[in-house]
Every structure is written in structure tokens, then in C-alpha cells.
Amino acid sequence: LGLSKAYLHEDQFFPGWTVLVFHRHVTELFQLAPPERVQLIEEVSRVAGALSEIYHAKKINYELLGNQLPHIHWHLIPRLPDDPAPLEPVWRVPHPPVHLTGVMLQHTIDRVRSALREKR
């Protein structure tokens, strides 16, 4: 990725939940120059496509809010066939947090990186 960095969200109750963070501080999408905006949307799409492929998602939720953290960043959330609350936004689904550690965390990161390499 050129303008952003992708991170797995610390809570993986919704498997594959990824946060894509723009490389410099900007609070609004319209503040970007058109070429940057186009490239950033391409990066969002590339990561979303990789997540969809890895997790066989029925849908990817795209969240670009910024109320709590005023910096351009997307939450990309694969919604799976066995989703526990398919009609609800993830923020409204009470759940115990799921934290990946060690081998599982590295395996997940490696899968995403591999899928992104294929999406170039």
C-alpha cells in the first residue's frame, strides 16, 4: 500500500476486521487532492477484496466515521455467512473480545499479506 497502512483490529470477534489508516493526518476525505483520493479508494478496495477472498465474506462493511478519532481511517469488516447479527452494525453487537495471539495472529497477518500481493 502506498498511502495507507492496514492493521488487524485488536478484537477479532468479527474475523478479518481490519483498520486502514491514511499515512498523514487529514480529517476529511474532501481534504485530499483528487489523485490521492483516488489512490486511497483503490487501496481500500484492494484490502477489502483481499479480506473478502480470504474470509469468503457475504459483504464487507466499510466504516469511515472519525467522531472518536478525527483522522481518516476505514474499518473494513468482513461479514460472514455465519454472522451472529447480520442485520446489525458491529458496534451494536455485544460480544466477548477475541484477541489473536502468537501463531494465530501471525497466520492471519500472513494470509492478508499474501492475498494483497496477489491483488496488485
Residue ranges of each PLM-predicted region?
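HIT superfamily nucleotide-processing domains
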Residues: 1-120
